[in-house]
A protein has these predicted regions:
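Aromatic- and acidic-residue-enriched carbohydrate-binding clefts of CAZyme catalytic domains
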Residues: 164-180, 515
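Active-site-adjacent structural elements in folded domains
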Residues: 181-182, 444-450
Length: 684
């Protein structure tokens, strides 16, 4: 509707414009069912580092009053003559400093990654994380080329659309008076989630999305529409332990975590702290002997083959024999009992005939292994118990220690050292998930001032991700709403705890807050200016937090105080993490230069990411383009001049660790010919 209203406003005939507006308003008020929103809300991205030239699309830098997209007719000195896309008969002249080139959604783009900075605190490790400063839609387009179907876990904390001007849509802040803010939020998320779905491993991966009560209903419906083939679960996580009272409504203490399970994905059973143990869960207990006699839905006639005698010696210490099932109608008293034995039948306390939980042959195998235990004689027979499949698995896996066998042949299990592993319920009341203490205060200890509102608790993010990557030490984890950088901090903590090699990619824009934007504009600065950009979230929050947490100091260089919670042995924050991160800014290449093959150096970081970001990202020095690159430390190679293929193949043979190559050629037949002569796993 927003796009239609913009078009209606451009109708010159006032009578016609008013009639059309009236009819459209009637349509908008009609009752609709299901999740209905404006899916085609206009959205574009400013390209501050792209030159303005004839034929490109531009917007005014201060687009609050004029969000129109203009087409540049000509550039002369410091001005550009432009026309609106819809009205090409009225030319307008702008100063170049007042406009910015933009990319509309659906427009062909040529992204590249420009190195900004890096931190290397593990020079001997080939593991490198990545932070990308970008509009996340365009970053996801690039990542689709790099990692389609390869991501194990996506964790995102998108803007909650509170109406407090805490996020931007189409280069403008969205506030609570915006009639289309829900459509903008859903359209914004829909576009990005469609791309995110392509990145996830369809056989085994998860999408994790956190949200509050304002948008969880809409988000849940959207996820259901976009992922109809999956199972979706919602967790309630207590994140505010000090609730601020609100007038005429309940205080907010929780947020919600949607988990979208793809393929065979499931949470891992983990050893958990006492906070998780707030409801009864049998999987948390030690060794459990189950009653062999079923107590419910257990009449003899329901399973006749489960009604048979167990012959126990008169002293009650040993099973001498297991009898055969008797047919329905036969009186159990007619069964002969071996000398020196007592026949034990599955009889309920009310005297009714029941059935055993195991068939004759299955029980015999359990007895042979010592997995059946005899109790005392009772009025109706004897209490007999056994170990079920889950308990036996814990014995055979070594979780329970068998210390011997008693005189009846039953195993003696030592479960004193057993640490219960289990999947908790979906109501999390975990002290470490407190966003104030372990989010806001933790971030302030790194940055020494408040630079970001409502950061996540490090441990809430850590725990949520851990359920799905605990058994994936080489998992690829993506967060394309990186915010303050909690996700990478959590991944580094996970790797430090269990020696994992998990890799994290974070994407964030470099927006400033609404208040900061006003302050900067009052001083005469505009987006793209250095003074503006240095206060953006990527440079002012995400990257400093990443560097400080890895190197173990605050922004002033002073060692961090305290230990990470729940780690054994204690992990000191001042020790940092053995981790490396490369920081890039997503830029856009001129299509003409790309077609002429003039911008290879800018493409190198993309190729590095394509091959798994192993080792430090290589750089080309000098203007001379080499014929080839052989990069054993990065485990890939590039042939730039196909006329040197023979030399390339010879050098490549010296490095069997290189299993990925990129071959530059204009002809498919040449590419196929070269690939046939290379012994590598991947060629592009």
């Amino acid at each position: 509707m927003a796009a239609i209203n913009d078009l209606i406003s451009q109708i010159q005939d006032e009578t016609l414009r008013n009639r059309i507006q009236e009819e459209v308003s009637k349509m908008a008020k009609q009752k609709k069912f299901g999740l209905v929103f404006e899916e085609h809300m206009p959205e574009s991205t400013p390209l501050y580092d792209m030159p303005i030239k004839r034929g490109c699309n531009v917007m005014r830098r201060d687009s609050k009053d004029d969000k129109s997209i203009y087409v540049v007719l000509k550039v002369e000195d410091d001005t550009a003559a432009c026309v609106k896309q819809e009205q090409k008969d009225e030319a307008v002249t702008f100063e170049l400093k007042d406009i910015v080139r933009v990319a509309e959604f659906g427009e062909s783009i040529y992204p590249y990654l420009m190195p900004v900075d890096s931190v290397c605190n593990a020079p001997d490790s080939d593991l490198w994380h990545t932070l990308i400063e970008a509009d996340n839609y365009h970053a996801l387009q690039l990542l689709e080329y790099l990692y389609a179907g390869k991501v194990d876990c996506i964790y995102i904390d998108p803007p909650y659309n509170t109406g407090a001007k805490d996020w931007k849509y189409n280069n403008d802040y969205v506030d609570g008076n915006d009639a289309y803010r829900h459509s903008k939020g859903l359209s914004f998320m829909q576009r990005r989630l469609k791309l995110a779905k392509k990145l996830l491993n369809p056989k085994d991966s998860v999408l994790i999305v956190t949200i509050d009560e304002r948008e969880y209903l809409r988000l849940g419906c959207l996820l259901g529409e976009l992922f109809p083939e999956t199972h979706i679960q919602m967790i309630s996580d207590l994140i505010n332990r000090v609730v601020v009272a609100k007038d005429n409504e309940f205080g907010r203490s929780t947020e919600y975590i949607f988990i979208v399970y793809l393929g065979s994905a499931s949470p891992a059973k983990l050893p958990l702290e006492e906070d998780w143990n707030h409801i009864e869960n049998s999987t948390k207990d030690g060794i459990h002997w189950a009653n062999l006699s079923r107590t419910t839905n257990s009449r003899r006639q329901d399973r006749p083959n489960m009604f048979y005698p167990i012959f126990v010696t008169r002293d009650g210490k040993r099973i001498a024999k297991i009898g055969d099932p008797i047919p329905l109608g036969q009186d159990r008293a007619t069964v002969s009992v071996p000398s020196g034995c007592v026949a034990v039948w599955p009889i309920h306390t009310n005297g009714e005939e029941g059935r055993w939980m195991q068939g004759k042959d299955g029980l015999a195998k359990l007895v042979q292994k010592g997995y059946v235990r005899l109790g005392r004689f009772t009025d109706t027979g004897m209490a007999i118990s056994y170990l079920n499949r889950a308990q036996i698995q814990k014995i055979e896996s070594g979780e329970y220690i068998v210390s011997g066998y008693d005189e009846s042949g039953t195993v003696i299990v030592d479960d004193s050292t057993y640490s219960a592993t289990y999947i908790p319920d979906n109501l999390w009341n975990i002290k470490t998930h407190d966003a104030a203490r372990n989010g806001t205060n933790l971030l302030s200890s790194l940055l020494k001032e408040k630079r970001f509102s409502f950061p996540k608790s490090l441990y809430s993010t850590h725990d949520t991700i851990r359920f799905f990557v605990a058994n994936k030490p080489n998992a690829l984890i993506l967060d394309f709403f990186a915010g303050s950088g909690t996700t990478m901090h959590a991944v580094n903590l996970l790797n430090a705890e269990d020696g994992g090699h998990r890799r994290c990619i974070m994407v964030t824009n470099n927006e400033v807050s609404a208040d900061e934007a006003k302050m900067l504009k009052d001083k005469g600065y505009q987006p793209g200016d250095a003074e503006w950009e240095k206060l953006g979230i990527a440079h002012y929050v995400t990257w400093p937090r990443t560097v400080c947490s890895i190197e173990g100091h605050d922004v002033n260089g002073k060692p961090l105080k305290g230990d990470y919670l729940g780690s054994e042995p204690p992990m000191h924050m001042a020790d940092g993490f053995k981790a490396n991160v490369a920081f890039f800014k997503l830029g856009f290449l001129d299509p003409t230069a790309v077609s002429l093959g003039m911008r290879f150096s800018e493409m190198l970081p993309t190729l590095w990411l394509k091959t798994g970001a192993k080792g430090k990202c290589p750089e080309l020095t000098g203007e001379q383009m080499p014929d080839m690159l052989i990069l054993p430390e990065n485990q890939f190679a590039v042939l730039i001049n196909e006329n040197t293929f023979a030399d390339f193949a010879e050098k490549l043979a010296e490095h069997p660790e290189i299993q990925t190559v990129f071959l530059a050629t204009d002809y498919e037949v040449n590419y196929q010919s070269m690939v046939k002569n290379l012994n590598v796993a991947n060629a592009y």
